[in-house]
Amino acid sequence: MIAPQPISRTLPRWQRIVALTMIGISTALIGGCTMDHNPDTSRRLTGEQKIQLIDSMRNKGSYEAARERLTATARIIADRVSAAIPGQTWKFDDDPNIQQSDRNGALCDKLTADIARRPIANSVMFGATFSAEDFKIAANIVREEAAKYGATTESSLFNESAKRDYDVQGNGYEFRLLQIKFATLNITGDCFLLQKVLDLPAGQLPPEPPIWPTTSTPH
């Protein structure tokens, strides 16, 4: 069965939940399978170009390992923030829909999701919102850890009592500290090959994922 398609991490939290719900509905309607492709990008490369791109990415390691590293970094940031700001706590988001979205990752630009994905760390939820000064402390910690990944381009859309955000990107990575009704930390990584693709010999395309029949099989 084809894995669920990753959800864009640029969507707000509630829109990601709606998108995941719609995927579940479509899965039921077509007999338990969801289409997992990215036609806008996968058509840009020939088969030989895909092979060359895949082989050039092999030394980066796997998507699964990269996701573990990012989640470890999210934990480091959250621990540092909690230690620096008295009374602050944190936990990984326990919403099953968000957890599923994080596990699925985000789409790459030139390879379909059955070949490569962008890892998403487990989402961090802080126990309390930040004051203006505390948000600066947290953002500085995010900045320091993001720089270790080569992410140094900073931006912010809003900085007021009701809404604050800090975003830093670079080298294919994005770290985002966001506060609206509650404060969260989200980290998205560069594009990495799935482990099952790394396990295949170089110089060839992975086999096409199977598409199961949509009609029920008699027992």
Swiss-Prot record:
Name of the molecule in the record: Putative lipoprotein LppA
UniProt subcellular location: Cell membrane
Residues carrying lipid (N-palmitoyl cysteine): 33
Keywords tagged on the record: Cell membrane, Lipoprotein, Membrane, Palmitate, Signal
Residues linked to a lipid group, S-diacylglycerol cysteine type: 33
Source superkingdom: Bacteria
Recorded family membership: Belongs to the mycobacteriales LppA/LppB family.
Species of origin: Mycobacterium tuberculosis (strain ATCC 25618 / H37Rv)
Residues annotated as signal peptide: 1-32
Membrane topology of the entry: Lipid-anchor
KW Lipoprotein (keyword) present: yes
GO cellular component, one term: plasma membrane
